[in-house]
């Protein structure tokens, strides 16, 4: 976690170092095994609380698979419909205009940070409360779904 935080601090806001898919997959793999190890060694921990700590990458991946399956596309094919990309395009369309990625990219991180940080915090708070952690997973997934569906409509309404 300290290494990831260090990477974020050194790399923000200009993104001079690219983590890439290999780095992201490695971090996800390690964090997933940490979660499994915790569940094996501390049976009082709710699996839903562990899922909350990894909520955004898991939920974003599941949403991408669902979206591509509904469109009869390859689930492994890339697209630009992830919530962070929609947020960045919304900032460009509504406030900053095109060719301003040096502003909208770090600003997207700031805008999304509270939403990305909230599920892990709730997961820590509900670490031993299985029902509450499960309800929190449902609530955050519903929030993500609503944000995903309504963000383009809001962006169109506030277009400059």
Language model features with spans:
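Alpha-helical transmembrane segments
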Residues: 1-160
């Amino acid at each position: 976690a300290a290494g990831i935080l260090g990477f974020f601090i050194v790399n923000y806001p200009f993104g001079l170092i690219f983590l890439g898919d290999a780095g992201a997959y490695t971090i996800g793999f390690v964090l997933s095994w940490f979660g499994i190890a915790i569940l094996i060694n501390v049976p009082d921990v709710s699996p839903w609380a562990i899922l909350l700590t990894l909520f955004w990458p898991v939920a974003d991946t599941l949403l991408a698979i669902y979206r591509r399956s509904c469109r009869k596309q390859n689930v492994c094919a890339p697209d630009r419909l992830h919530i962070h990309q929609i947020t960045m395009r919304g900032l460009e369309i509504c406030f900053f205009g095109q060719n301003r990625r040096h502003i909208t990219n770090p600003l997207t991180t700031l805008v999304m940070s509270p939403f990305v940080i909230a599920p892990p915090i709730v997961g820590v708070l509900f670490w031993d409360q299985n029902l509450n952690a499960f309800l929190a997973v449902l609530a955050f997934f519903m929030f993500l779904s609503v944000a995903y569906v309504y963000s383009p409509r809001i962006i169109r309404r506030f277009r400059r």
